[in-house]
Amino acid sequence: DTLMMAHMARLTGRDEQPYRTLAENIRRDFRARYVREGRLTVRHITALSMAIFTGMLDEDEAKAEAAALNQMIVDDGYQFTCGLHGMRTIFDVLTRYGYAETLFKTVTNTQHYGYGYSVSHGFRTLPEHFAFDVKLAGARTRVCSRNHHYMSFVDTWFFEYLAGIQVLGFGQE
């Protein structure tokens, strides 16, 4: 993240402006290619979530796209239809824009692949992927890892939003 690099440069006495300029250029180019009439041209939950999370949209656009993101999840039966990168941002975005209830319903959903589904099938740690019981070529898939941290964004959500334990700022603040 170029804005984080700018912050680190400032903290270490280096020039932050090259990073800030790069961030502005990235945002400008992203918007020129992917934003039309205030809407993201790619209509997938990962694209929406990441564009909102990274500040690529203006606030009014982000609010409208967060509502669209929420509706996609509701329409999909309260299930995540994204991969790792979408999972990284979706908890923060939906909570920030007032859709924590949708997240809760999605996380606790036992009917579709996800966190609740895994727990309802005996998992007490995070599997490598949620589709651990999908049959491929007549055989069940094998979950290689039953303690896969990369899907643990839900843990951060529990601490930061449900329990209210939040990081005060970047670094050691």
Identify the role of each PLM range:
Residues 1-173:
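Active-site core of glycosidic bond-cleaving carbohydrate-active enzymes
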